[in-house]
Amino acid sequence: IGKSTALSIIAGEKQPNFGDHEASGFQELAQRYKGTEAQAFFTALADEEINVALKPQHVDVIPDAYDGTVKALLQRVDERDAYDTVIDGLSLGHVESRNIDDLSGGELQRVAIAATVVKDADLYLFDEPTSYLDIKQRVEVSAFIRSLADEDHAVMVIEHDLIILDYLTDLVNVVYGESGAYGVVSMAETTKKGINTYLDGYLAEENVQFRKSSIEFEERSEKRYTKPDVITSWPAFTHEYDTFSLEAGTGTIYEDDIIGVLGENGIGKSTLMEVLSGEIAKDFDMDEVTMSHKPQHLDADDTLVRLYLDGAKQHKHTVID
């Protein structure tokens, strides 16, 4: 609905076209908002009097654009001698000598944030900065991003995690609309009010109902009263790599189970899933059961969605994490 597009315009990477499908430029934008703070901002942006740094949404494409170590990349884009600060603040010391292509999703995300922060900017924009991060890393990254804001610098963030949004921001703009068709940005509200407005689906000040029903978090009812059938189980096992070892205890999955696997990044959660699904060879037997596994990292190509899904149906163990 346009959140990333809006950030790209604020960053000066895209120019608004006002529905004419041709870029009209920031001067026209400034004229349309004459007498407002928006006019002052976009005039300064057009005159290059404001420096803006943007962390893009998709960090998985970084290895396609850059081949080298984390240290070399960050030192190349560092405009304010902040290398040591971002390495310490984002806990990147253990990966600074590694190649970009060898990083996990969470490590790539923090490197992308670091590459944005070392820019000499007045305004820092972060598009979904906590994707791929575990809970501990989300809190750490949020505190680091929040520390950037002072009397000379501002921060704007696109974030879907409402808890992190509450922790990170002072003001919130609610964006509503229809995916792929249009988007509307509300006026700014305090964070608490903005989050409640989003959950309610109704903008009182603008008298706009953008969702038919509110989002409510209900208490969970008690589960089963009868003992369900076992779907599958496994014994305790160990899986080792050259520099990493996963130790897993015995486990059982029953009908009607929804099981969460919770833990920090890089400690073997995906390996556990891959062993149980049969994608990694295991030295123990499990009850024969059909499994469907969505992997953590996706490789996009030009295959049509319908053809991809038709092909996936042909496999007993569907790999779609």
Regions found by a protein language model. Name each.
Residues 128-129, 136:
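Walker B catalytic motif
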Residues 99-103, 107:
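Conserved ABC ATPase signature
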Residues 152-158:
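Conserved H-loop
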Residues 6, 112-114, 141:
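Hydrophobic anchor residue at the start of the ABC signature
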Residues 1-81, 161-192, 252-320:
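ABC ATPase nucleotide-binding domain signature region
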Residues 123-125:
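Walker B motif beta-strand of ABC-family P-loop ATPases
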Residues 138-151:
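Helical segment within the ABC ATPase nucleotide-binding domain
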